[in-house]
């Protein structure tokens, strides 16, 4: 399943190290947010969260 397959509204807090905005997710993959940051259409495979958000390198 595409990790970005979720509504782009509301917050997404995946544990203590992964926080995304503009999405509506409740779970998080080990190496990547289960949702995309605003303006990101698709997460790159194998991307990792940097700090408290998914870095732009996560997007493709």
Curated annotation (Swiss-Prot):
Region span, Beta: 1-28
A Pfam family recorded for this sequence: Metallothio
Q: Determine the domain of life of the protein's source.
A: Eukaryota
Record carries keyword Mitochondrion? no
Q: For binding a divalent metal cation 5, which residues are annotated in this chain's numbering?
A: 33, 35-36, 49
Q: Which residues bind a divalent metal cation 6?
A: 36, 40, 43, 59
**Residue numbers binding a divalent metal cation 2:** 6, 12, 14, 25
Question: What keywords were assigned to this record?
Answer: Metal-binding, Metal-thiolate cluster
Question: At which positions is a divalent metal cation 4 bound?
Answer: 32-33, 43, 47
The protein's role, per its UniProt record? Metallothioneins have a high content of cysteine residues that bind various heavy metals.
UniProt comment concerning the protein's domains: Class I metallothioneins contain 2 metal-binding domains: four divalent ions are chelated within cluster A of the alpha domain and are coordinated via cysteinyl thiolate bridges to 11 cysteine ligands. Cluster B, the corresponding region within the beta domain, can ligate three divalent ions to 9 cysteines.
Please state what the protein is called. Answer: Metallothionein A
């Amino acid at each position: 399943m595409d990790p970005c397959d979720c509504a782009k509204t509301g917050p997404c807090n995946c544990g203590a190290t992964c926080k995304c905005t503009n999405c509506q997710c409740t779970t998080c993959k080990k190496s990547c947010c289960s949702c995309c940051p605003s303006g990101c259409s698709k997460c790159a495979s194998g991307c990792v969260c940097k700090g408290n958000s998914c870095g732009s390198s996560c997007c493709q």
